[in-house]
């Protein structure tokens, strides 16, 4: 584990693998669990022939800062600092959910640091999308008054109906406590409500793959299609799964990403 200081934040990150190719940096989504909770299962599958970097953004468990409001640009600065501190050269950059707009901002602001870009279940803006605005507002309300309700809402929207029915009641009940509404998670939710990277998207020059989940009811797939349309020359793929598609369809997700990164 390594750390780098960015403003008031001491950002924790890990490097796994020893491959000679471009490193792959994975940027997590909303949640205080950060890198461990998001990438613990699928991350090692990318480490066979490359180095894989995971980090905890402000609001996640291992990174400590002043607890103030977050912005896309602030978190992008943390990703940039990790790339530079790790000394791996330009990286392939993959962002999931909240991590997708953050990763897109990194690619737009520092094109010299990004070889290829993968945006998974991401979106360009929240204000104007009444579905997502209301969902994130609901999470804020539940986070302040009903932690179990928060966990159930996140579980219900994070996975497809078929997946939830497939794992059954015991499996679903085990998922509910996995994303508690900690202060850090609620800082992420506040950021989710404020996302607007539309002005940055035309500046992205890295080869880009956008991946949407056809059954995503956290960030509906239309948002991924809009990202693809806004990034010149980007490739696009859909996986028939809910928001956390790498949990529901791990093999297909890994094949989709490695197929793009190896091309």
Residue positions per predicted region:
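Short beta-strand/loop motif that positions the catalytic acidic residue
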Residues: 204, 210-212, 216
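Active-site loop/oxyanion-hole signature of alpha/beta-hydrolase fold enzymes
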Residues: 44, 53-94
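Conserved alpha/beta-hydrolase catalytic His-Asp/Glu region
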Residues: 128-130, 148-200
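Catalytic histidine-centered segment of alpha/beta-hydrolase-like enzymes
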Residues: 241-254
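Gly/Ala-rich beta-loop-alpha elbow adjacent to hydrolase catalytic centers
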Residues: 95, 99, 103
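Conserved alpha/beta-hydrolase "acid-adjacent" motif
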Residues: 217-223
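Conserved HGGG/HGGXW glycine-rich cap/lid loop of the alpha/beta-hydrolase fold
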Residues: 6-64
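Flexible "cap/lid" loop of the alpha/beta hydrolase fold
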Residues: 104, 108, 115-144, 184
